Structure formats: structure tokens, C-alpha cells
């Protein structure tokens, strides 16, 4: 739909103008929340908010469950993952959010997990998190037994329980990566909406992909190869 693509372009331009590398994490997180709400995740169907311990969640109001979990970091934070290094605090926090959501809240509706600083997005499939973390009974029980304790225990959970597990599986963790800054020079040009790379970005952020909703046959197949080539 050209109207949706044009709105996405317009909102992306606004987001990139408003994101500020020197601003605190909360400010940029708020801007991303607005971007999602104004584009493909309308408040009639979705609720996007901080949720207890999780930085940001997308909840599907129809099922009353979170479907996407976000961990945010300040731009250039030492705690942020990179393409070459996933053994970072941002990942430990995301794993903890996921375990609590899947095992304590019994929420099996999560589809994707995201680490972002506003510009960069590392998007992980829930199925992979389940295989590598959720199914690990020892990991889950250690987290659960430590979780209900004081805040200083949180660092213990990250460093002593989750970190070794992330170290062990880091080479098996695949993700889709996109840096919105690579679109910055083009978002003001109306013809960007015809470009395959822009359409791929649009689909990447859509409920069809992030929530794994069924989609019409005319959409390009949403596979990792497709995104890797375009983004």
C-alpha cells in the first residue's frame, strides 16, 4: 500500500531527525515508541509500553499478550551488543526478560526479541531463544531461584548465570541487523518508497514479520537471506 509506505517514510524521517546520540536511553526509546505507533502498530490493536522489568513491549490487545520484547541502550553504550560481540549486558538483560516472560508469565506468544539504541536493531527470533535459553532447565531454575532477591543479585544473574550461557551459544545466535542511519540521506526523497531496500525495511518492522502474522501471497518471502541481501 503506497499510503502506508509514504507514511513510513515520513515517520522514519521524523525519527531520524529527532534521535540524538547524546540523549539518554529513555528519550530515544520514547521516539522509537512513537515511530512504531504512528506507522504499523496502531493503538487500536497494540499497546506499546515499558512493562515491569522490560524496556519496551508490544502487546497485542486481541490476545492480551506481549508479542515483541525490546531492550534499549544509550547510543555508544559499552553495554550495547555489536555485530561482532553479543556477549554484552544488553543481551543478558534480554535473555532475563525472555525467561521471565516465557516461564513466569507463561507467555508463549512472543515472536521476536530486539536490542536497539534507536538507530541500530538486532532482531532475534523467539524460536531460537527458546532453543538456546528457554529449554535449558538448569538456566531457568537458576534464574528463578535468584530472581526474587535484591537488586545487587541482578548483576549476579547477568554475570554468573546468563553470561556463561551466552558465551557458550553465541556462535549459534543468528539475528537480522539494520542500522536506520544508513537510510538517513534518502528519507527526504519521495522516491525512496519504490526502492527494494526501503520496502524490506518496511516489512521488517511490520506485524507481518515481527508478529509473524499470515500474509498475502504477493509479499516477498520473509526470509533471512532476503533481508541480509537488502539491508
Predicted regions, residues:
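Charged, often low-complexity linker/regulatory segments
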Residues: 1-50, 199, 224-228
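Charged, often flexible domain-edge or linker segments that flank or initiate folded functional domains
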Residues: 54, 59-87, 93-231
Amino acid at each position: 500500500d503506497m499510503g502506508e509506505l509514504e507514511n513510513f517514510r515520513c515517520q522514519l524521517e521524523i525519527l531520524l531527525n529527532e534521535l540524538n546520540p547524546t540523549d539518554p536511553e529513555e528519550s530515544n526509546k520514547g521516539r522509537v515508541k512513537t515511530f512504531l505507533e504512528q506507522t504499523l502498530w496502531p493503538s487500536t490493536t497494540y499497546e506499546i509500553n515499558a512493562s515491569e522489568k522490560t524496556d519496551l513491549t508490544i502487546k497485542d490487545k486481541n490476545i492480551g499478550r506481549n508479542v515483541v520484547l525490546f531492550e534499549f541502550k544509550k547510543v555508544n553504550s559499552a553495554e550495547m551488543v555489536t555485530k561482532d560481540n553479543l556477549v554484552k549486558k544488553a543481551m543478558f538483560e534480554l535473555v532475563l526478560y525472555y525467561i521471565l516472560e516465557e516461564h513466569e508469565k507463561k507467555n508463549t506468544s512472543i515472536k521476536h526479541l530486539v536490542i536497539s539504541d534507536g538507530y541500530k536493531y538486532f532482531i532475534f527470533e523467539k524460536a531460537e531463544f527458546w532453543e538456546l535459553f528457554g529449554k535449558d532447565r538448569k538456566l531457568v531454575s537458576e534464574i528463578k531461584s535468584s530472581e526474587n532477591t535484591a537488586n545487587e543479585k541482578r548483576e549476579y544473574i547477568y554475570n554468573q548465570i546468563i553470561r556463561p550461557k551466552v558465551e557458550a551459544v553465541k556462535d549459534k545466535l543468528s539475528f537480522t541487523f539494520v542500522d536506520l542511519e544508513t537510510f538517513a540521506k534518502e528519507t527526504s526523497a519521495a522516491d525512496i518508497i519504490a526502492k527494494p531496500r526501503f520496502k524490506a525495511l518496511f516489512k521488517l518492522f511490520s506485524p507481518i514479520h515481527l508478529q509473524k502474522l499470515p500474509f498475502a501471497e504477493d509479499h516477498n518471502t520473509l526470509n533471512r537471506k532476503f533481508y541480509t541481501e537488502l539491508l
